[in-house]
């Protein structure tokens, strides 16, 4: 099993073994300082947010609001992956919210992040869905997180995934 909480849903003939979920070696070996330098950030906190490759409207909208409320302070960096469905967020930020992304280097929007292991290493806070792989990566890196479980998954499993971390004080 990946988490001890899953055992109550099993009907094993033999005892269950909690092994966790393996994570990529490149994630474990990603260097925080190198990753931050590569990203071009100083000591200010980095908030990494994402809703998956397709995007998540609720996360994109919340991050848009967060950026609008905080961008003038320039006290942190925002690195957000909009996903395929969220590419319109660029126009919302620039045209509707009147925030010039070229002038605000502390706001970094991408459709997709190809080198997530380095971006996670650079981050101080991660806002994301509560899929099993994402949670394993957050735990492996010891990252502070705000989890937004998807309501569109079978048996509400992302909620249960998130609660396993919340109950341990890890999210």
Report the location of each language-model feature.
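Active-site-proximal region of nucleotide-activated glycan assembly enzymes
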Residues: 1-32
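Short, glycine/polar-rich helix-capping loops at beta-to-alpha or helix-loop-helix junctions
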Residues: 3-12, 134, 155-162
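Short, acidic/turn-prone active-site loops that include or flank metal/cofactor-
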Residues: 4-6, 22-24, 112, 132, ...
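Short loop/helix-cap segments at secondary-structure boundaries that form the rim of catalytic
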Residues: 6-16, 90-91, 119, 138
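Short, structured coil segments at secondary-structure junctions
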Residues: 11-14, 74, 103, 141-142, ...
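Donor-nucleotide binding loops and adjacent catalytic segments primarily
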Residues: 32-34, 40-125, 159-163, 167
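A donor-sugar binding/catalytic signature common to diverse glycosyltransferases
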Residues: 116-157
């Amino acid at each position: 099993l990946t988490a001890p909480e899953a055992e109550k849903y099993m009907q094993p003939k033999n005892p269950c073994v909690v092994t966790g979920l393996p994570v990529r070696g490149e994630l474990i070996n990603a260097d925080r300082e190198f990753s931050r330098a590569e990203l071009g950030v100083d000591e200010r906190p980095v908030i990494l947010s994402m809703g998956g490759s397709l995007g998540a409207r609720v996360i994109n909208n919340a991050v848009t609001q967060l950026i609008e409320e905080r961008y003038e302070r320039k006290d942190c960096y925002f690195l957000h992956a909009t996903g395929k469905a969220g590419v319109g967020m660029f126009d919302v930020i620039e045209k509707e919210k009147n925030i010039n992304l070229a002038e605000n280097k502390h706001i970094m929007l991408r459709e997709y992040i190809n080198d997530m292991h380095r971006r996670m290493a650079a981050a101080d806070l991660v806002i994301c869905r509560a899929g099993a792989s994402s949670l394993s990566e957050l735990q492996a890196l010891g990252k502070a997180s705000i989890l937004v479980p998807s309501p569109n998954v079978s048996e509400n499993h992302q909620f249960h995934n998130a609660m396993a971390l919340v109950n341990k004080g890890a999210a």
